[in-house]
Amino acid sequence: MTKYVGIRGHRGSGKISIAYLIANTIEYLMDFKNVGEDFDNLYKSWCNELMKDEQNAVYNIDTPHVYLESFGDLPKMLTEMLTNIPHEYIYSDYYKDHVFINIRTMEYIEMDDNEISNFDHDLWKSQDLIEFVEEYGFGEFDSYWISLREFILYYAKTTSKYLGNDIWVKLMRVSEERDNAMQERYNIFGKGDKYKLFVDLKAVSEVTYVKERNGFIIKINRPRNIKEKGFDNLENDTRYDYELNIEGSLYD
């Protein structure tokens, strides 16, 4: 049986860190659920060891029973296909803010903060570029430079505009049905429960996808985090089962 969990929160709120902790906690509970009265002390000791590995706390989320999913991976895959930018760049916060793409030619360059400040061309935001192109087209300039982060948003928003805001949900559904068929055919997961952990829910349709599968939603609040607007506004969507108010870091 597949169980669904969704995490929502603004950029910088700690969604990936929480996902990592949830995934590994589920594994721990499944491995040590019969340890009896020593469970609390064993769990605390395990958490202390887990938090020591900073690299894993960011990148190692998939575990034997928990699989990470993200609707945001689909436009990232499109970006990788269009630009030939290395896969690891597209999933790195540093490179997303320091790699810039000329939309006219699809060439890309990496710049440090000083080079960004002294760059000879305007650097566009995704929404500004969408509105400009709608009104004037691409004909006015030879180059339109945009950060990798904004490039991903640009194509995600443009695709959603013409194919519908739920296009990424539809693609996820097709992908999941295909994966489930393969897993059943080859018994990839074996018997027992498995979990799909959806990180970074941004759209109403994405929350609906998890809830329709009897999943639960975790909303993360973190003071002073960087706010970002998704394809749909989740501020008025009250469909969450748990709310976490976070201060400090994962290690706190």
Predicted regions and their residues:
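ATP-dependent small-molecule kinase phosphotransfer cores
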Residues: 36-194
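Small-molecule kinase domains that catalyze NTP-dependent phosphoryl transfer to phosphate-bearing small molecules
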Residues: 6-11, 20, 36, 42-43, ...
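Active-site catalytic pocket residues across diverse enzymes, especially alpha/beta-hydrolases
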Residues: 22, 26, 30, 83
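Conserved lysine of the Walker
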Residues: 15
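Hydrophobic anchor at the start of a short beta-strand
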Residues: 66, 196, 214-218
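Switch II (G3) loop of P-loop NTPases
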Residues: 197-203
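Hydrophobic packing residues within well-ordered alpha-helices of enzyme cores
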Residues: 22, 79, 172, 207-210
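Short hydrophobic/aromatic beta-strand immediately N-terminal to the Walker A/P-loop
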Residues: 4-6, 197
